[in-house]
């Protein structure tokens, strides 16, 4: 769980910026949005499969693009 200790010489804006950075690193907002509604295990697997396919196609595209430059 993110948390920061505010020093006496630290402004609120700086402390808030550090807190936001920690929240982003820990993916708290993303996880909260994902858990907002129940997702069936089959739907989750389907999304993971689609994401894996997109990732593979992107890598393949980048590899072919790189090889064409050689």
UniProtKB/Swiss-Prot annotation:
GO cellular-component terms in the record? ribonucleoprotein complex; ribosome
> Domain of life here?
Bacteria
| InterPro entries xref list | Ribosomal_bS21, Ribosomal_bS21_sf
Lyase keyword on record: no
Residue ranges that the Swiss-Prot or TrEMBL entry lists as coiled coil: none
* GO biological-process terms attached to the record: translation
Q: Which Pfam families match?
A: Ribosomal_S21
One term of GO molecular function: structural constituent of ribosome
The protein's UniProt keywords, in alphabetical order, are: Ribonucleoprotein, Ribosomal protein
Similarity section: Belongs to the bacterial ribosomal protein bS21 family.
Protein name, UniProt field: Small ribosomal subunit protein bS21
Q: Which gene encodes it?
A: rpsU
